[in-house]
């Protein structure tokens, strides 16, 4: 039966369409690759053979609508790659800024913690810290972040309340009334990105 079907398929492809399809606009010279793939697909499906892989032209990939994403990859956990699943991937975890930190009880938050992180209000963190750049700068200068690569045991703890009192009672910074960047000779050839360029009378062509 299989040989009969295959020989019929060969004859059909060789001599063209059957008389019943003689009035079709297609001619034997104009049989497209898509028609052949459909025919082969139907024959293989009737024979119980696995479906053949249908490859589409590259320009059809541009017709996709909506967001497209690819999930998975050789870096996501233990996988077995290859056509038979016999190639294990071994990925070493790289250390860097993107590596999630271990926020356990011992080394989770820096010392001192950032103002009142979750669950740390009883450890003496300041609930009402001033929202100023000056306090933030001083706070970060005295902050001891937990860093196992640069963790020096000689660094002592500091008193947050003492720093707060120092910042509160310290001398206020004087405001500048004059912008130092607007002093001096102005550069006329510098044009802002969104402004219309201004040309002097010397640059204009005589009419």
Swiss-Prot record:
Give the signal peptide, or none.
1-22
Q: Which UniProt keywords apply?
A: Chaperone, Cleavage on pair of basic residues, Disulfide bond, Neuropeptide, Phosphoprotein, Secreted, Signal, Sulfation, Transport
The main location is secreted
| GO BP, one annotated term | peptide hormone processing
A Pfam match is: Secretogranin_V
A cellular-component GO term for this protein: secretory granule
Q: Where is this region: Disordered?
A: 168-207
From the record, give the cysteines joined by S-S bonds. 116-125
Q: How is it modified after translation?
A: Proteolytically cleaved in the Golgi by a furin-like convertase to generate bioactive peptides. Sulfated on tyrosine residues.
GO MF term set: enzyme inhibitor activity; enzyme regulator activity; unfolded protein binding
The similarity comment for this entry is: Belongs to the 7B2 family.
The protein's job, in short, is: Acts as a molecular chaperone for PCSK2/PC2, preventing its premature activation in the regulated secretory pathway. Binds to inactive PCSK2 in the endoplasmic reticulum and facilitates its transport from there to later compartments of the secretory pathway where it is proteolytically matured and activated. Also required for cleavage of PCSK2 but does not appear to be involved in its folding. Plays a role in regulating pituitary hormone secretion. The C-terminal peptide inhibits PCSK2 in vitro.
Subunit record text = Interacts with PCSK2/PC2 early in the secretory pathway. Dissociation occurs at later stages.
Task: From the Swiss-Prot or TrEMBL record, give the protein name.
Answer: Neuroendocrine protein 7B2
